[in-house]
């Protein structure tokens, strides 16, 4: 390294790195990621899937909320627009699923083993809840999208480490895939139910004979 910095000749440094790489492959082949995993991780880092999903869910959630309120208080419905919004939401959910799948392949374990992974998984379950319980109500879709955005935003705060790390020994169990996945996913459904309950209570204040039918979402 010193020779390369001084003379701008990196041949010896490259040879040393190549020898180190070969040594690692021989002595640590069970620990080192494969060439395919490294290639996928580079693609994963360039895509910045979860960071982009924060803006996606936030913008779509606010727009869905606007459309839902307009349909209730102004009695203006557009089935084609609602179907388009739902299709876009499903696309984002599938993109979110792809990100989790890539992280699972890269790390070699289920992607809900630390704080960052748990948050992005809860965001995924919140989006899944919106897909499952959506009944042509933009408020339901808006609540799901905004909840996912908030959870994903918290995941990308400075105190949360997004680095892919080795699985700690205490989590090296099939319970991580079965038990932890179900319990953690339930937070998304619980959060959506709570948020919809708050929205319903607020809308009851404005309920009258004209919008009674629309408010019974």
Model segments located where?
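Polytopic transmembrane helical bundles with strong interfacial aromatic enrichment
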Residues: 1-217
């Amino acid at each position: 390294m010193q020779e390369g910095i001084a003379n701008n000749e990196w041949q010896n440094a490259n040879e040393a790195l190549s020898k180190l790489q070969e040594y690692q492959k021989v002595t640590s082949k069970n620990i080192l990621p494969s060439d395919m995993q490294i290639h996928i991780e580079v693609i994963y880092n360039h895509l910045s899937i979860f960071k982009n999903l924060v803006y996606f869910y936030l913008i779509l959630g606010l727009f869905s909320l606007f459309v839902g309120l307009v349909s209730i208080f102004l009695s203006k419905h557009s089935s084609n627009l609602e179907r388009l919004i739902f299709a876009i939401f499903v696309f984002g959910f599938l993109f979110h699923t792809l990100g989790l799948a890539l992280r699972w392949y890269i790390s070699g374990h289920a992607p809900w083993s630390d704080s960052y992974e748990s948050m992005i998984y809860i965001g995924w379950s919140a989006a899944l809840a919106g897909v499952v319980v959506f009944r042509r109500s933009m408020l339901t879709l808006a609540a799901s999208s905004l909840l996912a955005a908030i959870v994903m935003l918290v995941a990308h705060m400075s105190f949360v480490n997004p680095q892919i790390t080795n699985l700690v020994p205490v989590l090296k169990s099939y319970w991580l895939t079965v038990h932890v996945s179900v319990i953690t996913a339930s937070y998304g459904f619980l959060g959506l139910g709570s948020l919809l309950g708050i929205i319903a209570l607020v809308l009851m204040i404005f309920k009258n004979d004209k919008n009674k039918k629309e408010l019974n979402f």
